[in-house]
Amino acid sequence: MIELGLHTDNWRPLSMSFEASCAKIAAVGIKHLEFAAIHGQNFIQALGYDPGISLQANPLALRRYLDKKGLKVSQIDGSYPMMGPNGSAFGVQYVTQTIRFAAELGCPMVDTVDGAFETPGM
């Protein structure tokens, strides 16, 4: 059975927090969500204006929070331009940490991107 899920980034233009995004998703009866992983800390997210989650957050506490709302994480957005000039320096570590976080959270998938531009010869 195919089930619909939403990315918390849908509420980014409204400067909503992760918690506010989860409340909106749960309110319409959707059970699955995706969120962006933040590698480190983000000032805007700490103020409650970004619906992403820091990879330094406690995944078990996050899982308990989502369980109470009846939500499951279907995928974590660990997007970094892997084929860009900093892909090997930063992207690999970022995605590796996102995979670890997903495993601790019980999330089955992580996504990333190759980059914004076509790499010559690829």
Go through the PLM ranges and name each one:
Residues 1-109:
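N-terminal pre-domain/capping segments
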Residues 102-122:
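Active-site groove signature of glycoside hydrolases
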